[in-house]
Amino acid sequence: MFGGNMRIFEVMRETKETNIYLKINIDGTGKYKIDTGIPFFDHLLASFAKHGCFDLIVKARGDLEIDDHHTVEDVGICLGLALNQIEKRNIFRFGWAIIPMDDARATVAIDLSGRSYCVGNYEPKREFVGDLATENINHFFESVASYGMLNIHYEVIGKNEHHKAEALFKAFGVALDLATKIDERKGVISTKGEVKL
């Protein structure tokens, strides 16, 4: 799961609200061990890992007796911090995906640009799916973009909130897999000669 000469990044974050451990192998095969205390969020992260072919471990303990906001936010922060460690040389840099799931369809485009920006239109019609407050899905992606220093744009349509959310996380995984592909022809893909602020 984490052997060999691979791009593996590890983040630990502990606050008064959460205790998060995250490890991701960008060059993995889609294996995962995820326990955030929020079963539907675990399912979404598993979908991201499986369809992006990332090996992912997430262990999170948060103040769920209050609500799920801090846990979802801080997992997003940790994933962003991990992704920000990716070497921005000899990779595709851009990634995109259009993923259907029955009635739902999600479109995601990302740029590992060294600049943080998130634009999304996921508009849930239900307050919860399982134990996950659907409003926190947008906040998760905002946190990933902010701490990962990447652009994330996404659009979601559909009727079923489970399908909409799952299609979105699958599309994010597929798009990120493309953006992180090694291509030694690329060098640094920027007319500035570097990918950072």
Swiss-Prot record:
<dbReference type="GO" id="GO:0005737">
    <property type="term" value="C:cytoplasm"/>
</dbReference>
<dbReference type="InterPro" id="IPR020565">
    <property type="entry name" value="ImidazoleglycerP_deHydtase_CS"/>
</dbReference>
<comment type="pathway">
    <text>Amino-acid biosynthesis; L-histidine biosynthesis; L-histidine from 5-phospho-alpha-D-ribose 1-diphosphate: step 6/9.</text>
</comment>
<dbReference type="InterPro" id="IPR038494">
    <property type="entry name" value="IGPD_sf"/>
</dbReference>
<comment type="similarity">
    <text>Belongs to the imidazoleglycerol-phosphate dehydratase family.</text>
</comment>
<dbReference type="Pfam" id="PF00475">
    <property type="entry name" value="IGPD"/>
</dbReference>
<dbReference type="GO" id="GO:0004424">
    <property type="term" value="F:imidazoleglycerol-phosphate dehydratase activity"/>
</dbReference>
<protein>
    <recommendedName>
        <fullName>Imidazoleglycerol-phosphate dehydratase</fullName>
        <ecNumber>4.2.1.19</ecNumber>
    </recommendedName>
</protein>
<dbReference type="GO" id="GO:0000105">
    <property type="term" value="P:L-histidine biosynthetic process"/>
</dbReference>
<dbReference type="InterPro" id="IPR020568">
    <property type="entry name" value="Ribosomal_Su5_D2-typ_SF"/>
</dbReference>
<keyword id="KW-0963">Cytoplasm</keyword>
<dbReference type="InterPro" id="IPR000807">
    <property type="entry name" value="ImidazoleglycerolP_deHydtase"/>
</dbReference>
<keyword id="KW-0368">Histidine biosynthesis</keyword>
<keyword id="KW-0456">Lyase</keyword>
<keyword id="KW-0028">Amino-acid biosynthesis</keyword>
